From Swiss-Prot:
<feature type="binding site">
    <location>
        <position position="94"/>
    </location>
    <ligand>
        <name>[4Fe-4S] cluster 1</name>
    </ligand>
</feature>
<dbReference type="GO" id="GO:0051539">
    <property type="term" value="F:4 iron, 4 sulfur cluster binding"/>
</dbReference>
<protein>
    <recommendedName>
        <fullName>Hdr-like menaquinol oxidoreductase iron-sulfur subunit 2</fullName>
    </recommendedName>
</protein>
<dbReference type="Pfam" id="PF13183">
    <property type="entry name" value="Fer4_8"/>
</dbReference>
<feature type="binding site">
    <location>
        <position position="163"/>
    </location>
    <ligand>
        <name>[4Fe-4S] cluster 2</name>
    </ligand>
</feature>
<keyword id="KW-0472">Membrane</keyword>
<keyword id="KW-0004">4Fe-4S</keyword>
<comment type="function">
    <text>Has menaquinol-oxidizing activity. HmeC and HmeD subunits may together mediate electron transfer from menaquinol to an unidentified electron acceptor on the cytoplasmic side of the membrane.</text>
</comment>
<feature type="binding site">
    <location>
        <position position="101"/>
    </location>
    <ligand>
        <name>[4Fe-4S] cluster 2</name>
    </ligand>
</feature>
<dbReference type="InterPro" id="IPR017896">
    <property type="entry name" value="4Fe4S_Fe-S-bd"/>
</dbReference>
<dbReference type="GO" id="GO:0005886">
    <property type="term" value="C:plasma membrane"/>
</dbReference>
<keyword id="KW-0408">Iron</keyword>
<dbReference type="Pfam" id="PF02754">
    <property type="entry name" value="CCG"/>
</dbReference>
<keyword id="KW-0479">Metal-binding</keyword>
<dbReference type="GO" id="GO:0046872">
    <property type="term" value="F:metal ion binding"/>
</dbReference>
<keyword id="KW-1003">Cell membrane</keyword>
<feature type="binding site">
    <location>
        <position position="91"/>
    </location>
    <ligand>
        <name>[4Fe-4S] cluster 1</name>
    </ligand>
</feature>
Length: 555
């Protein structure tokens, strides 16, 4: 992990609103995102305006008419998105959101208060799009758009993870994440894009996944997983890739193909899919084209989000599946629950249409009859979250689990922002965990469920150059984890989000909390008794980490 100071200092500042509108001139190291390179935003697969220029934050190399371009982009946003116009007008600056932002709590920077972050762009809106701002200027809370203001807009637009916790506490329901999303789109129109995010967007548009994995790499990773499972279970398992006529398309975040602890979740998927096929005949395929459920476009711009999520519906139609299961990813679910169905047309093939007229799994596999998806939070657009899927299987007693296999773990659960707040999937993961393990404890109520604190790395904030911001932003979550670690002896933090799993090992190390990180599907895989293969509860000797399920005598 990048070197961090032993102690961090948080200085709370409370300047006047007049002072707040003065653009900052000094930019903190560890909080400033790198700008994109031409190879990310001027490639054959992903092109952004003025992307052919290599920029540095201290030399933006803006186009000559950048101001007109930016304001035209703002005008376009105001005309096409009524919510943005509403959010610009109705804020009364009550401050209810101020201390709800993890970045404000961690940095003490007043411009990281959600109300102030929105005010940075709202002041430009007032100056150019309201009569009061045009006539009274600064007295009406308006300010001129110049290069210093533009730099400040970029600096603070990329100190927000779009987690929407602030919106939960806003009495008017102002969605600051949406404001920041449209602001980032405006910045992209004058050539200002964040490097970390556009690396992932370009790779996904080119190869189908954020990591740039080619089909052979993805296939090899899955085969490696099957070989590992043979060592742990003794069973010869298989999977399908690009199988036409399969019942279900499964889409995972690409980190599950190789990263740790994501890999253990991948093994859990493979065990479950083999059990369901062997026992009920339900076929589930992966795709090398739609090999990424995540969508960094949802943090960048509408156009980028639309480009990336289009491939999933196309692949579902090409393969002729009846529905899609999505894996353990956070922003996948903001995208697939709220965006995809208005950005791209859903599949129209017969198998899809027929299943969603009567969404009973028994129509695909008779032994699963009664498992229905009529009112599932994630089922509105043809998608089912893997944890809702598993919860249904457990509730209807379609799989056998042995909770004692997870007895070495004392777990707590982190609600990913986009899963809990973004789609309302709150109780199902807890239902699954309580059914596959004996030792589970929630963190304090004001830090979980719809009030969950962000991991501090979503929204494009997982970039290495933002390590200071990340460790500060994750502080509220780490304090809650420390509470259950001390009170209950928790030794693993579970989360169904790929970015969380990448962020938390660093955060736990920095905040000196000696516990592991994993995903719920790892616990499901450990507990799952492969009855279709003749396995008995006592047969399994190793967990999905390759460690003994029960400690040796004397340990």
């Amino acid at each position: 992990m990048e070197e961090m100071p032993e102690r961090i200092e948080i200085k709370q500042k409370f300047p006047s609103w007049r002072e707040m509108l003065k653009p900052v001139k000094e930019f903190e190291e560890g909080r400033l995102s790198y700008l994109s390179l031409p190879k990310q935003v001027d490639s054959e697969w992903f092109k952004m305006p003025f992307g052919d220029v290599e920029r540095d934050f201290h030399d933006l190399k803006l186009p000559e008419n950048w101001k007109e371009i930016f304001l035209e982009a703002m005008k376009d946003t105001l005309e096409k998105n009524r919510s943005f116009k509403l959010f610009m007008d109705i804020c009364v600056r009550c401050g209810a959101c101020a201390d709800k932002c993890h970045y404000y709590i961690g940095t003490g920077d007043p411009k990281n208060m959600p109300v102030a972050r929105a005010e940075l762009i709202r002041s430009v809106y007032r100056r150019y799009f309201t009569p009061a701002g045009k006539f009274f200027g600064e007295w009406a809370g308006a300010r001129e758009l110049n290069e210093d203001v533009l730099k400040e807009l970029y600096y603070y637009a990329y100190q927000c993870s779009l987690c929407r916790r602030c919106s939960l506490f806003c009495p008017y329901g102002i969605d600051t994440a949406e404001i920041v999303w449209w602001l980032r789109r405006m910045l992209s129109r004058v050539g200002l894009n964040q490097r970390f995010m556009t690396i992932s967007i370009e790779a996904s548009s080119r190869t189908g996944n954020h990591l740039g994995l080619l089909p052979g790499g993805m296939y090899g990773a899955i085969q490696q997983g099957l070989e590992e499972l043979k060592d742990y279970t003794g069973f010869d398992l298989h999977t399908y890739i690009n199988k036409k006529g399969a019942d279900i398309l499964f889409v995972a975040p690409s980190a599950d193909y190789f990263a740790t602890p994501h890999w253990y979740v991948m093994l859990g998927y493979l065990l479950l899919f083999n059990e369901l096929e062997e026992k009920y005949g339900l076929t589930i395929t992966w795709s090398t084209y739609a090999s990424e459920g995540g969508n960094f476009g949802t943090f960048h711009s509408y156009e980028a989000a639309q480009l990336l999520n289009s491939k999933i519906y196309k692949e579902a139609e090409r393969l002729g599946v009846s529905f899609i299961i999505g894996g353990e990813c956070g922003h996948m679910w903001r995208d697939k629950h709220q965006f995809i169905n208005t950005m791209n047309l859903p599949p129209k093939h017969e198998e899809w249409r027929r299943f969603w007229e009567d969404p009973d799994l028994g129509n695909l596999a008779e032994g699963l009859r009664g498992v229905r998806f009529d009112s599932y939070a994630s089922g509105e657009h043809g998608w089912i979250h893997i944890l809702e899927f598993v919860a249904a299987l457990i509730e209807h007693k379609k799989i056998v689990v042995d909770k004692s296999r997870n007895d070495k773990w004392i777990a707590t659960y982190h609600d990913p922002c986009n899963v809990a707040r973004g789609m309302g999937l709150i109780e199902e993961p807890r239902y699954v965990l309580r059914n596959v393990m004996n030792n589970f404890y929630d963190m304090p109520e004001h830090t979980i469920k719809d009030k969950t604190y962000c991991c501090g790395a979503g929204g494009g904030m997982l970039a290495d150059e933002l390590m200071d911001l990340r460790m500060r932003g994750v502080m509220p979550r780490m304090m809650a984890v420390r509470h259950v670690y001390r009170k209950y002896g928790v030794n693993i933090l579970l989360t169904p989000c790929a970015i969380d799993k990448a962020q938390f090992p660093h955060a736990l190390e920095y905040w000196k909390i000696p516990i592991e990180v994993g995903g719920p599907m790892e616990m499901v895989g450990n507990a799952l008794v492969m009855t279709a293969f003749g396995e008995k509860p006592e047969d399994r000797q190793f967990d999905l980490r390759g460690e003994p399920l029960k400690p040796e005598e004397g340990e």
